[in-house]
Amino acid sequence: MITNIIISLAVIFVILGAIISAVTAIGIIRLKDIYSRGHAAGKSATLGAIFLLFGTFLYFIATDGYINMQLIFGILFILITGPLSSHLIMRAAYNNKTPYTKDTKIDELKNEFKDKMI
């Protein structure tokens, strides 16, 4: 009984992760500038991958009865490196003066880099 519930939760997490990853891929294709694309890739792709790995983790607990440490390390690795790498890529694009779209109206980093020669 409890095994079926855990497997059902695992399937729900895997399906949600796949849907979030698919929406992320569509967003990366459709968004106009690197800053919007980086936001989509850094936030929602990380969430989709974590849901997929967590669903797999639950499945292994339910079927085999053991905790897979590789999946836990994978979840932690993606949780740390996904948003961090996206942030660094967007910061590098800003330093290279990559243009915004014309819809972007706010530049919050303008004053931070005003005096620095980067």
From Swiss-Prot:
What's a Gene Ontology MF term here?
Answer: sodium:proton antiporter activity
* Localisation: Cell membrane
- A single GO CC term, please? plasma membrane
UniProtKB keywords: Antiport, Cell membrane, Hydrogen ion transport, Ion transport, Membrane, Sodium, Sodium transport, Transmembrane, Transmembrane helix, Transport
Asked if the keyword Membrane belongs to this entry, the reply reads: yes
**Hydrolase recorded as keyword:** no
**Pfam families the UniProt entry points to:** PhaG_MnhG_YufB (PF03334)
Q: Which residues cross the membrane?
A: 9-29, 47-67, 69-89
Q: What membrane topology does the UniProt entry give?
A: Multi-pass membrane protein
Q: Which residues form the signal peptide?
A: none
Q: What role is this protein assigned?
A: Mnh complex is a Na(+)/H(+) antiporter involved in Na(+) excretion.
Which protein family is it in?
A: Belongs to the CPA3 antiporters (TC 2.A.63) subunit G family.
Assembly and interactions? May form a heterooligomeric complex that consists of seven subunits: mnhA1, mnhB1, mnhC1, mnhD1, mnhE1, mnhF1 and mnhG1.
* Classification via PANTHER family: ANTIPORTER SUBUNIT MNHG2-RELATED
Q: What is this protein called?
A: Na(+)/H(+) antiporter subunit G1
